[in-house]
A protein has these predicted regions:
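Ser/Thr/Asn(+Pro)-rich, low-complexity disordered segments
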Residues: 1-174
Length: 174
C-alpha cells in the first residue's frame, strides 16, 4: 500500500487517496483485514472518505453510505442488478453523480471509524423502512426520486424517500 503510485484529491483541505469508484467499501474493507496505522495517508484517506460520504448524504438530503450494491433495476428473471456506486470527487470513475444508492452495510463498515455517526445513520435507515426479517435490506435507491416527484407518483413524492431494494445479499449481512 505504501509504495503504490496513487492520485490524490482534497477533502476538507486534507490529502485523500482517490479510489476507482469511490465506494465506502473500497476505503474501509481493508480495515477488516489489515492493521491500521494512525496518522498515515491511508488512515487519513479512510477518515476523509467517510467524512465526504456523510457530507454528500447531507447535501443530497439522504442517509449516507454509498457503495457497491443491488439497485432498483431487475432483469427479465426479476433479479436485482448490482454495481458500484460512489461519491463524486472521491473516484476516478465517470458518472458517479448519475446514481444515488445507499447501502446499510457501508454504514456498518463505518462503525469502525465513527460508531456514533454510524449508529445515527443506521437508525435513520431503519426509520426509512430498511429493516427486514434478516437484518437490513440491501439498499435504498434514490436515483429516480426527483424524476418521480416531477411525474407526480406518490411513493416518491418526498425526495428524501427512495425505493427500498428488498433483498438480502449474504456478503453484505456481516
Amino acid at each position: 500500500w505504501f509504495h503504490l503510485g496513487r492520485l490524490l484529491t482534497s477533502v476538507e483541505g486534507m490529502p485523500t487517496l482517490l479510489s476507482w469508484s469511490a465506494t465506502l467499501f473500497e476505503y474501509l474493507m481493508p480495515l477488516l483485514l489489515m492493521k491500521r496505522f494512525p496518522d498515515t495517508l491511508l488512515d487519513q484517506s479512510c477518515r476523509m472518505a467517510l467524512r465526504r460520504q456523510i457530507a454528500y448524504g447531507r447535501e443530497r438530503r439522504v442517509p449516507w453510505g454509498i457503495s457497491e450494491a443491488a439497485f432498483n433495476v431487475v432483469d427479465r428473471l426479476d433479479n436485482y442488478q448490482y454495481k458500484a456506486f460512489g461519491v463524486p470527487g472521491l473516484g476516478l470513475k465517470r458518472g458517479l453523480a448519475d446514481d444515488l444508492v445507499v447501502a446499510p452495510y457501508a454504514t456498518a463498515l463505518a462503525a469502525m471509524l465513527d460508531p456514533t455517526e454510524a449508529a445515527r445513520n443506521l437508525r435513520r435507515l431503519a426509520g426509512a423502512g430498511l429493516e427486514g426479517a434478516y437484518g437490513f435490506y440491501e439498499s435504498i435507491d434514490f436515483t429516480h426520486a426527483e424524476a418521480t416527484e416531477v411525474l407526480g407518483e406518490a411513493r416518491n413524492a418526498d425526495p428524501s424517500h427512495g425505493t427500498v431494494v428488498r433483498a438480502f445479499l449474504a456478503h453484505h449481512q456481516g
